[in-house]
């Protein structure tokens, strides 16, 4: 059985673990969780695809997602490609954390002569396989962090997470559940997720716990940094 979500109270810990343990993909994990990007869409991202706009005192990030192979020298670099070219908005969860991550990432990992946002240890565009390996380390360390917690519920959740299968698809599930809790409109969910097939979005309507103003409260609290 696959897990498609993380309980909201552990989501910040998940992001923080990525920042501490795998900083080279921490921004990518955030973009997956709060922008719904697939793994292949993360590694296909170029700096020119990132647009930041400011409305009032709030900033917004839009990503232009296109099917592009940044590592033509590796036949298996982009296994899934970008399934649907689109403009994707990233939810600004946890106050200014997105901007902190983005600035730190640029400063540390932006390489001259390489347009890719995510790069490997050699400074080349990161492949699907490398991202997957780095995420596997995150999974391990996240479970370990929960297991070592003094909180009984966190320890129990660590056991749960180690019992079932999950990988990068989990982040997209987190995003889908956040959106599904805010609307009962399947077309809207599909649009946010970049789905062509409505059945993919429908599963998040049938699985959701609540779909009322409580969902909008969750998104608002995530923005303010009050959850996690």
Language model features with spans:
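C-terminal secondary-structure termini that scaffold catalytic or DNA-interacting sites
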Residues: 79-80, 219-228
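Major-groove DNA-contacting interfaces characterized by cationic-aromatic clusters
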Residues: 85-134, 138
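Basic, Lys/Arg- and aromatic-enriched nucleic-acid-binding interface segment
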Residues: 8-39
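The alpha-helix within a helix-turn-helix
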Residues: 32, 43, 190
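Conserved tyrosine-mediated DNA breakage-rejoining catalytic core shared by Y-recombinases
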Residues: 45-100
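Residue-level marker of regulatory loop/turn positions in helix-turn-helix DNA-binding domains and
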Residues: 3, 20-22, 31, 160, ...
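Catalytic-site neighborhood detector that most strongly recognizes the C-terminal catalytic loop/helix
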Residues: 193-218
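Short, basic (Lys/Arg/His-rich) helix/loop patches that form interaction surfaces
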Residues: 124, 132-191
């Amino acid at each position: 059985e696959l897990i498609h979500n993380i309980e909201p109270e552990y989501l910040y810990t998940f992001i923080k673990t990525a920042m501490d343990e795998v900083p080279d993909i921490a921004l990518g994990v955030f973009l997956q969780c709060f922008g719904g990007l697939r793994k292949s869409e993360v590694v296909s991202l170029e700096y020119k695809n990132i647009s930041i706009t400011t409305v009032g005192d709030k900033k917004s990030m839009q990503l232009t997602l296109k099917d592009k192979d940044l590592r033509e020298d590796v036949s298996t670099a982009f296994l899934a490609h970008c399934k649907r070219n689109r403009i994707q908005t990233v939810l600004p969860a946890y106050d200014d954390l997105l901007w902190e991550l983005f600035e730190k990432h640029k400063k540390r990992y932006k390489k001259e002569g390489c347009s890719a946002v995510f790069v490997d240890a050699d400074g080349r565009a990161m492949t699907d396989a490398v991202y997957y390996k780095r995420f596997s380390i995150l999974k391990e360390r996240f479970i370990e962090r929960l297991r070592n917690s003094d909180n009984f519920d966190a320890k129990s959740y660590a056991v749960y997470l180690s019992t079932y299968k999950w990988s990068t698809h989990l982040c997209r599930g987190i995003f889908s559940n956040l959106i599904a809790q805010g609307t009962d409109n399947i077309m809207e969910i599909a649009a946010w997720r970049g789905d062509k097939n409505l059945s993919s979005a429908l599963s998040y309507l049938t699985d959701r716990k609540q779909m009322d103003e409580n969902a909008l409260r969750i998104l608002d609290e995530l923005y303010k940094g009050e959850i996690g």
